[in-house]
Amino acid sequence: MHMNKRTNRQDWHRADIVAELRKRNMSLAELGRSNHLSSSTLKNALDKRYPKAEKIIADALGMTPQDIWPSRY
């Protein structure tokens, strides 16, 4: 799901984030490990504010954390 299709500025659903990563042949676990984190660390950003993890995920999607989680910023 690309932000230009979203007009209501709601946070992305966690399944949409995971799906977008999958489309890019990535997973949260792989992304975490490639950033020297535990394979489960990035999952925390799906449910609560975690700026470091949010940035890693957003960068992987070519976006900003504010695009994905507008309610947190």
UniProtKB/Swiss-Prot annotation:
Keyword Repeat listed: no
Compartment(s) of residence: Host cytoplasm
UniProtKB keywords: DNA-binding, Early protein, Host cytoplasm, Pyruvate, Repressor, Transcription, Transcription regulation
GO MF term (any one): DNA binding
DNA-binding positions: 28-47
Pfam families, sorted: HTH_35
Listed InterPro entries: Lambda_DNA-bd_dom_sf, Ner_HTH_dom
Induction of the gene: Expressed in the early phase of the viral replicative cycle. Early gene transcription is repressed by viral Repc (latency) and favored by viral Ner protein (lytic development).
Record's GO cellular component terms: host cell cytoplasm
UniProt keyword Zinc, yes or no: no
UniProt similarity note: Belongs to the ner transcriptional regulatory family.
Function: Switches off the PcM promoter thereby blocking expression of the major repressor Repc (latency factor) and favoring transcription from the early promoter (Pe) and hence viral transposition and lytic development. Negatively regulates the early promoter (Pe) thereby controlling its own expression and keeping the level of early genes expression independent of the viral genome copy number.
Protein name listed in UniProt: Negative regulator of transcription
Origin species: Escherichia phage D108
